[in-house]
Regions:
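Short, small-residue-rich loop/turn micro-motifs
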Residues: 85-87, 177, 283, 312-313
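Core alpha/beta nucleotide-donor-binding catalytic domains of modification enzymes
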Residues: 2-117, 127-131, 136-139
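Class I S-adenosyl-L-methionine
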Residues: 66-78, 88-261
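Basic/polar N-terminal segments that are highly enriched at the extreme N-terminus
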Residues: 1-3, 352-353
Length: 353
């Protein structure tokens, strides 16, 4: 069926989930996020978000009845509610994350699901949400939505299995309203071919030496690196991290005990012939991970990071360097969102038949 199913995206960020769902055949009626620059990014891309209403809003301020009325919908009529509540509070890498107020955004999102009663919903988050920090919050919220009449599907997906040139594990929870006796949704099957870093970004020309944008490719520029950081990159082959640095190039903290201090892939180069590591909100610095270019003596550019997240090459991002890196690193990879969206659309097609 070619029916366009209606969707609302909460916590839309720069629009990775939105764009993937659009590519899967959904009509995004409305999206919102608390980040001003993220909404500006969506509005700066009319090529990809036609007739798309996006607003800066806090989910706690979104009144469900008013939202549905503004979209000419009643409770129970929406096809899909999508959302990936900010996940930093569930990250196993963050000290003090147990107390992060954002942990409770999952509960608020589920309360919106129960009030809106979409036919289906998506909840995407980091695997840590199923661990010590998130398990109680998540299971309590899912129990409520299950009691309200939903089948719950829960699985950890790796983006590299769905056309994303990146190793990125995420919990993808899909809810399916119990309008029929048995659940219909099935997760997408992993693809055999994994897209490598070489396949994804090797075609890009080298950015200008002076740190300016490439004249034909926005956000494709190099950071200035210290002489020592350049020497570190020169000492590494593609796919190597700080474990391969000679002692004189190790950071002082790593000299104390390289085996127990810090992450082992910092100060590293990406591999050419494998998928990239997870693109984080700080991917613009190779001191934060294996984010050095495979062969050029620089960190990967913002544009390269966006491509590794499967955003189109001409996708516009609004904000300064830090803001754009955060938007890219926090996004749901477009190709993975599309793969899940296609399966949800198949489920809705079966529903209508």
């Amino acid at each position: 069926m070619n029916k366009k199913y209606k969707c609302i995206d909460c916590f839309c960020g720069a629009g990775g989930l939105c764009l993937g769902l659009i590519q899967a055949g959904f009509d995004i009626l409305y999206s919102f996020d608390i980040e001003v620059k993220a909404i500006a990014t969506i509005k700066a891309n009319p090529k990809y978000f036609k007739n798309h209403k996006a607003e800066t809003r806090d989910i706690y301020d979104v009144e469900t009845a008013g939202l549905l009325e503004s979209l000419n919908l009643n409770s129970g009529e929406l096809d899909l509610l999508a959302g990936g509540p900010p996940c930093q509070g569930f990250s196993v890498q963050r000290i003090g994350a147990d107390l992060d107020e954002r942990n409770h955004l999952v509960e608020e999102y589920i309360s919106k699901v129960i009030a809106i009663r979409p036919k289906m919903f998506i909840l995407e988050n980091v695997p840590g949400i199923e661990g010590k920090r998130g398990k109680n919050i998540l299971h309590s919220a899912l129990a409520k939505v299950e009691e309200s009449g939903y089948f719950i599907h829960e699985k950890i997906l790796d983006a590299q299995d769905y056309g994303v040139p990146q190793r990125r594990r995420r919990v993808v929870i899909v809810g399916e309203r119990k309008d029929h006796k048995f659940p219909l949704f099935e997760y997408p099957k992993p693809q055999e071919h994994k897209i490598t870093v070489r396949e994804a970004i090797a075609y890009l020309p080298e950015p200008p030496e002076d740190g300016s944008d490439h004249p034909h490719i926005s956000l494709h520029r190099r950071d200035r690196l210290s002489a020592k950081n350049i020497a570190r990159l020169q000492a590494l082959k593609p796919g190597q991290g700080r474990d391969f640095l000679p002692p004189e190039l190790l950071a002082d903290c790593h000299k104390v005990s390289s085996k127990i201090i810090g992450h082992r892939n910092v100060y590293g180069r990406m591999p050419w012939d494998d998928v990239a590591p997870t693109i984080t909100a700080r991917f613009d610095s190779f001191t934060r991970g294996m984010f050095g270019h495979p062969e050029q003596n620089r960190s990967i550019s913002l544009r390269e990071g966006a491509i590794l997240q499967t955003f189109p090459e001409d996708f516009v991002f609004v904000g300064n360097k830090v803001e754009v890196a955060r938007q890219i690193g926090n996004a749901v990879p477009v190709a993975m969102a599309m793969a899940v969206g296609i399966q949800i659309k198949k489920c809705l097609d079966k529903w209508n038949n």
